[in-house]
């Protein structure tokens, strides 16, 4: 089972292939919201790193936001085209859900988890998670300055993507800085163990 994971939620394009023996191969391109021009090259580079052909992909996972609508559509359309072309199942999850998936118990077990990613201006997307469910609560869009009012640093720790740290004000929080490659491995591991159920797109 080789899983292709595509993310165009941010201004960049990230593609990972997690192989049957749980090796991860990642390509990242800081495309500055020009994913449509770079996504094919990113895929081909990742396939080359993994030493796989497209026909060897058994399932595809694509993130579905939140974020720039055009960027999200590029990733979803690209993933759907591949899925239909190779007759592979296509699944989706939000980027906030993706950030919430850990293969092992996190080190801040005494606090609740929130996934955070920047929106436009001084706003951020936030969602709370627990170990028992992929998504426990509704996603919120709030001002960065209101984060501590809504989610006390004494009660919550934060998961965020590594290349977005500079866009977030997290000084008073315990946090875990996530790498896309590790996130991909954690996601596939959880799916294999049937600990999470993803939405299938058809």
Where are these regions (language model features)?
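Oxyanion-binding and handling regions
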Residues: 1-22, 36, 91-202
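N-terminal beta-alpha supersecondary unit
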Residues: 1-64, 157
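Short amphipathic alpha-helical face segments that pack within enzyme cores
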Residues: 38-41, 77, 81, 98, ...
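DPxDG-like acidic metal-binding loop motif
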Residues: 59-95
């Amino acid at each position: 089972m080789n899983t292709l994971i595509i993310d165009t939620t941010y201004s960049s394009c990230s593609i990972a292939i997690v192989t049957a023996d749980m090796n991860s191969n990642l390509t990242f391109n800081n495309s500055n919201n020009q994913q449509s021009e770079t996504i094919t090259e990113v895929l081909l580079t990742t396939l080359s790193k993994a030493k796989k052909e497209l026909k060897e992909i058994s399932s595809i996972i694509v993130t579905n936001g939140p974020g720039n609508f055009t960027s999200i559509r590029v990733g979803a359309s690209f993933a759907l085209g591949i899925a239909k072309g190779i007759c592979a199942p296509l699944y989706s999850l939000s980027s906030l859900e993706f950030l919430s998936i850990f293969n092992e118990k996190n080190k801040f077990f005494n606090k609740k988890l929130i996934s955070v990613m920047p929106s436009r201006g001084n706003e951020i997307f936030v969602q709370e998670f627990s170990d028992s469910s992929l998504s426990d609560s509704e996603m919120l869009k709030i001002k960065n300055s209101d984060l501590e009012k809504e989610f006390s640093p004494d009660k919550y720790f934060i998961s965020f993507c590594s290349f977005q740290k500079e866009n977030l004000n997290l000084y008073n929080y315990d946090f875990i800085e996530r790498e896309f490659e590790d996130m991909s491995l954690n996601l596939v591991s959880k799916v294999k163990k049937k600990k999470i159920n993803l939405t299938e797109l058809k």
